């Protein structure tokens, strides 16, 4: 049990996919201008990352390895991710039309979020078990969500702040992301892998 807790904490804080591994930067910068949209994107990405991580593990273990077609791993994982995203899109459209409209184009773009594919491929590289894959996917999603929501809250505060003209927009956003990354470096050494 301790192993899974350490894996979760390590994935969320120490090896954060956005701030440490630089995966998922497109939605991080694109959806983080409003807190409501960031929360919705976080929920959708959490669902997709966790489900895609587990599904990719199953596809790898029970289809690709037995048939000796592991060279199709990346293509297979992209297909699995696309199916999971389409399923998520249908669920969000039925349950929350407002959130569906708010997310707009970003919901289908989860398919191309490199963090989702990165989690699936890193599960294989790290030789995780089924449960470890689920925890790793969930931890990556929680870390992504945490950073996205914090960054969106900071950007809303920055929109109301008196920022010098040369730093407005993407400039101050990148500086803020860099400061967040340095803050997360403080968690280095918290969990040893």
UniProtKB/Swiss-Prot annotation:
InterPro entries: Ion_transpt_RnfA/RsxA (IPR011293), NqrDE/RnfAE (IPR003667), NqrDE/RnfAE_oxidrdctase (IPR050133). One of its GO terms (cellular component) is plasma membrane. Its EC number is 7.-.-.-. It is found in: Cell inner membrane. Pfam families: Rnf-Nqr. Keywords: Cell inner membrane, Cell membrane, Electron transport, Membrane, Translocase, Transmembrane, Transmembrane helix, Transport. One of its GO terms (biological process) is electron transport chain. The chain crosses the membrane at residues 5-25, 39-59, 63-83, 102-122, 134-154, 171-191. It is a multi-pass membrane protein. It comes from the Bacteria. Belongs to the NqrDE/RnfAE family. The complex is composed of six subunits: RnfA, RnfB, RnfC, RnfD, RnfE and RnfG. Part of a membrane-bound complex that couples electron transfer with translocation of ions across the membrane. PANTHER family: INTEGRAL MEMBRANE PROTEIN OF SOXR-REDUCING COMPLEX, ION-TRANSLOCATING OXIDOREDUCTASE COMPLEX SUBUNIT A. NCBIfam families: PRK05151.1 (NF003481), rnfA (TIGR01943). This is Ion-translocating oxidoreductase complex subunit A. It comes from Pseudoalteromonas translucida (strain TAC 125). The gene is rnfA.
């Amino acid at each position: 049990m301790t192993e899974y807790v350490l894996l979760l904490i390590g994935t969320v804080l120490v090896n954060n996919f956005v701030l440490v591994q630089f995966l998922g930067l497109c939605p991080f910068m694109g959806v983080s201008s409003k807190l409501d949209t960031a929360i919705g994107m976080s929920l959708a990405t959490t669902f997709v990352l966790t489900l895609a991580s587990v599904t990719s593990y199953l596809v790898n273990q029970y289809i690709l390895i037995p048939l000796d077609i592991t060279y199709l791993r990346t293509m297979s994982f992209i297909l699995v991710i696309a199916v999971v995203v389409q399923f998520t899109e249908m669920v969000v459209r039925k349950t929350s039309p407002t959130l569906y409209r708010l997310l707009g184009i970003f919901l289908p773009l989860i398919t191309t979020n490199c963090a989702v594919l990165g989690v699936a491929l890193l599960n294989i590289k790290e030789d995780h078990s089924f449960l470890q894959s689920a925890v790793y996917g969930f931890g990556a999603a929680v870390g992504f969500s945490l950073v996205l929501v914090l960054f969106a809250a900071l950007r809303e505060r920055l929109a109301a702040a008196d920022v010098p003209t040369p730093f407005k927009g993407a400039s101050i956003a990148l500086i803020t992301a860099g400061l967040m990354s340095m803050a997360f470096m403080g968690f280095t050494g918290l969990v040893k892998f």
